[in-house]
Amino acid sequence: MQTPATSLLIRNAHVLTLDDDDREWECADIAIEEGRIVAIGPDAGARHGKPFERTLDATGLLAMPGLVNAHFHSPGNLMKGSLPGYPLEVFMLYEVPPLADGGDSSRLAYVRTMVGALEMLRRGITSVHDDAYHVPVATRESIDAIMRAYADAGIRATVAIDQPNIVEYDKYPYLAALLSDDERFAMDKAPRQTTEELLALYAYLIERWHGADNGRLSAAVSCSAPQRVTPDYFAGLSELSKRHDLPFNIHILETKVQRVLGNEKFGKSLVRYVHDLGLLDERMMVIHAIWLDDDDIGLLADAGCTVAHNPVCNLRLGSGVMPYYKLRAAGVPICLGTDEMNTDDTVNLWFVAKTASLLQTLATRNYREWPEPQEMLAALTRGGARAMRRAHDLGRLAPGCVADIALLDLDTVAFTPLNDLRRQLVLCEDGGSVRYTIVDGRIVYENGRINGVDEAALRRELRELAGGYREQLSRAAAEARRLEPHYRSMYLRAAAEDVGMNRWLA
């Protein structure tokens, strides 16, 4: 784990707080003590009245809240650029093969998680909300590997166990009828964990890691998606979320196939299904939320849910365009995520914000409604903080908040000339201007290096481990190719259904 933070003074920074008053100073100090901001302003250092362990001269640098990657799957970190463009249902067939039998080693899980965390820190991303899946089953060892990686990297991480527990063909419409008896039998026999086994793993995650390292590491819960779990497991997760005030990750209506599934299996939308179970609440971060109707949006707003928008992933998989304006009008808070490295192929949250902003210009001709830079900056920071149940002390620079800060060089091409700081942060910055990343008051990245980590050695090890991983994927891909015609038929049939809306541009 990283060494404990003591005290740090950031001097002479251009400060963008993104607080309730959106305060900005062209030259100010930020005083940090025991991982939290204690004073901010032109004379914050003098007002503190104590010596600092370190003073950082930030002349020419912008200090802003660290970015929050609100939706991520670390197990995809080895798969950047590995798969062609497929719709989600076909994509997942290759990504998480339903008949997979071999698991990843704990060392592989550690290294791939670590590499992703370091890439985020280099871009000024100080927090990640990791919906970590485990193939074929979750174990204490795989949970520990992921959490230790985040502990050692120095990033703030909230982590869930994303583990479906129903048979593969029941997750989709029409698929059971398309498969042969032998194929269904093989899926029936595939490893699958019980409600009791999964809740026991959650108990371990919470007891061992929730609140660790001064609260930098924490637990969330995840059902993956409502159609992928049994009702008793779903209810058990909801109870855990309420008892410990944990975020609840839930993918809902990411694709048209899922809209059709809700109608076919439950006779209602998946949002209405969750609501009718009595499980829709303010702890839920609803991921993707593309194929929503007006009733769904009203239910999300009434429940106080947050929506995680992943526009690059949505484009990569052809899932559709999220109804941003309707969600905004209903008052649904929005945060931004990269999703995983095989559906975004990077962890560049700056590019996600730019894509989210520009994509919505195609959704309305009323240009006065187009997203303003301030909306995207809020989604990059405070929106993700809310989804992580940290709205009170994360995502803004203010006394009492955790000291999660990105320092960007204003003498770069992104800000030359400096015409509009907020607009250029959203439209010009790509993470290349980040010079320092501070998490919990600790400088974890400075001037091109992650403190305390031999990145070159880590990358070498990752390349060595990736060879065996690619062989494993190659074997799985052969089975996936055999099943793909069934998934394609299912996808095309669902795509042709009239669901009363269209979220595609075509």
Where are these regions (language model features)?
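Glycine-enriched alpha-helix->loop->beta-strand junction motifs that scaffold or abut catalytic
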Residues: 238-247, 279-282, 299-308, 329-334
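Divalent metal-coordination and catalytic microenvironments
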Residues: 13, 30, 35, 60, ...
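His/Asp/Glu-enriched, well-ordered alpha-helical/loop segment
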Residues: 276-283, 325-412, 428
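Active-site microenvironment of metallo-dependent hydrolases
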Residues: 1-28, 33-38, 380-506
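Active-site gating loops and adjacent loop-to-helix segments of metal-dependent hydrolytic enzymes
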Residues: 78-109, 166-192, 256-283, 306, ...
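Alpha-helical scaffold segments that flank or form the walls of functional sites
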Residues: 80-131, 136-156, 198-214, 463, ...
